[in-house]
């Protein structure tokens, strides 16, 4: 229990996440499903709600819903159906939204949310998922300065899933990390791009408190904070709403606390406050009714299994395997499995390398740094994972030093050449011929007899200087380890 003055309280948060899916077409028509474009150009009679236009379900839409349900640990129902949700708003052109109210596609899931800070050992909390249902997005209202508003119906009919959690989150940070986990999983399996700036992932958070006041339990009314499109917004809005409800309780203004009272709030980021949009004392009547123009979804066990199996290895399973198989740290695996492309890129390099750990180090320290610096992606690189594996291998074989490897990597970035080609062109390859190195060591010792005597008189730092002279005389080609061993051997003779 948390403390606020003389009160003890618990925070209760549940989330409803709306996620746009990356299907080729819209949910119930053949219009292109792509963000943006000239307003009202990716539309047809169906998504404009014209009389007589009949919807038809996209098979890919259903498949993506199954994939999401499988990835989030849900039971996929063999039977589900569509319903109409009626309300009146300018961007809802039909006057109703096609959704799944009574029988959703997916139910009873759960996700493990890692609550630990970066570089800490994982600390997981299980968040239950009540349901995932299919529904269509609505148009986009554009409020221009002046007396007019415009509506872009390109977004009307875009396929969504709504993921409804149980009220299992007990801090604003948990709510933000839950949303982050959902985004990571759904991006990883390829059903969404998760671009929150474009509205591909939006969160409604239901927040209230259980307060113990002098031994008596009291629950504040639920506030539903709508349409948050960033992790920071979720955390900040829930944090503010908790403090607002505590202050309201302490004000003893209990008129607003009557049974069934509920507020719909918006998050005003500039002011850092939640703002009341509407209040209601009874459940909102959306006049749900079965969608008469769409058949129920009747899915065979075989079809559900085939679609579920196509998802492949999920991020958490991949993390555990990477730690065990490649002996990587928690930080390494968290980063490498943050996106499927990165995980597959690393694994392809690891399988061709003598040191998967060093491959991981190069990818995390050098490759990702370049991508961040240039705001590019792995697909933009002029070389593939096999080149990183080759670079690590030549370092491990002693053909070049780690310092030389940085120069080779720079050439790979600029030209896309193989490490072996860069090494050959620049004459970088180290010489491991012991007779060649011994000859150079003898020459250095003969030319620097005074320095050798200084070492014998106790100036041990001279050994490093002599080593530098050997490397200089060899043009940087002498194998450093062999050279160091021979210098030390010669000094102790």
UniProtKB/Swiss-Prot annotation:
Its EC number is 6.3.5.-. The keyword Flavoprotein does not apply. The keyword Oxidoreductase does not apply. Keywords: ATP-binding, Ligase, Nucleotide-binding, Protein biosynthesis. It catalyses: L-glutamyl-tRNA(Gln) + L-glutamine + ATP + H2O = L-glutaminyl-tRNA(Gln) + L-glutamate + ADP + phosphate + H(+); L-aspartyl-tRNA(Asn) + L-glutamine + ATP + H2O = L-asparaginyl-tRNA(Asn) + L-glutamate + ADP + phosphate + 2 H(+). It is an enzyme of class 6 (ligase). Pfam families: GatB_N (PF02934), GatB_Yqey (PF02637). It comes from the Bacteria. Transmembrane segments: none annotated. GO terms for biological process: translation. Residues 473-493 are annotated as: Disordered. Belongs to the GatB/GatE family. GatB subfamily. Heterotrimer of A, B and C subunits. Allows the formation of correctly charged Asn-tRNA(Asn) or Gln-tRNA(Gln) through the transamidation of misacylated Asp-tRNA(Asn) or Glu-tRNA(Gln) in organisms which lack either or both of asparaginyl-tRNA or glutaminyl-tRNA synthetases. The reaction takes place in the presence of glutamine and ATP through an activated phospho-Asp-tRNA(Asn) or phospho-Glu-tRNA(Gln). This is Aspartyl/glutamyl-tRNA(Asn/Gln) amidotransferase subunit B. The gene is gatB.
């Amino acid at each position: 229990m948390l403390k606020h003055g003389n009160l003890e309280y618990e925070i209760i948060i549940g989330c409803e996440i709306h996620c746009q899916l990356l299907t080729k077409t819209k949910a119930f028509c053949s219009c292109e499903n792509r963000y943006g474009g000239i307003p009202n150009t990716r539309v047809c009679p169906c998504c404009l709600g014209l009389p007589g236009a009949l919807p038809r379900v996209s098979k890919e839409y259903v498949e993506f819903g199954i994939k999401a349900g499988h990835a989030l640990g849900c039971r996929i129902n063999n039977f589900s159906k569509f319903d109409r949700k009626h309300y009146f708003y300018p961007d809802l052109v039909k006057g109703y939204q096609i959704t799944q109210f009574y029988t959703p596609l997916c139910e009873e899931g759960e996700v493990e949310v890692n609550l630990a800070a970066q570089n800490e050992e994982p600390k997981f909390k299980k968040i239950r998922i009540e349901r995932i249902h299919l529904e269509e997005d609505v148009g986009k209202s554009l409020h221009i300065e002046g007396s007019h508003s415009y509506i872009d119906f390109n977004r009307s009919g875009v396929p969504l899933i709504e993921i409804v959690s149980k009220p299992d989150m007990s801090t604003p940070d948990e709510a933000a990390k839950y949303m982050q986990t959902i985004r990571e999983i759904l991006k990883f399996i390829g059903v969404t791009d998760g671009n929150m700036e474009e509205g591909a992932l939006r969160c409604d958070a239901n927040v209230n408190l259980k307060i113990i006041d002098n031994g008596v339990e009291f629950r504040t009314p639920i506030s539903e904070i709508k349409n948050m499109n960033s992790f920071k917004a979720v955390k900040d809005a829930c944090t503010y709403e908790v403090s607002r409800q505590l202050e309201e309780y302490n004000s003893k203004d209990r008129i607003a606390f009557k049974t069934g009272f509920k507020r719909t709030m918006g998050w005003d980021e500039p002011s850092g406050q939640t703002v009341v949009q509407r209040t209601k004392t009874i459940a909102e009547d959306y006049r749900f009714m079965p969608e008469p123009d769409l058949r129920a979804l009747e899915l065979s066990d075989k079809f559900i299994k085939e679609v579920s199996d196509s998802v492949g290895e999920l991020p958490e399973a991949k993390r555990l395997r990477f730690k065990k198989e490649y002996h990587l740290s928690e930080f390494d695996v968290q980063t490498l499995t943050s996106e499927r492309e990165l995980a597959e890129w690393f694994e392809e390099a690891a399988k061709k390398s003598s040191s998967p750990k060093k491959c991981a180090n190069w990818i995390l320290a050098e490759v990702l740094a370049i991508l961040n610096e240039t705001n590019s992606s792995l697909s933009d690189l002029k070389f593939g994972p096999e080149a990183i594996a080759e670079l690590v291998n030549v370092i491990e074989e002693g053909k070049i030093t780690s310092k030389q490897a940085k120069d080779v990597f720079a050439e790979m970035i600029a030209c896309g050449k193989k490490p072996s080609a860069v090494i050959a062109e620049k004459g970088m390859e180290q010489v491991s011929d012991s007779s060649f190195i011994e000859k150079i060591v003898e020459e250095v010792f003969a030319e620097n007899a005074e320095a050798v005597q200084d070492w014998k008189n106790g100036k041990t730092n001279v050994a490093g200087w002599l080593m530098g002279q050997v490397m200089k005389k060899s043009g940087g080609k002498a194998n450093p380890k062999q050279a160091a061993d021979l210098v030390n051997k010669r000094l102790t003779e």
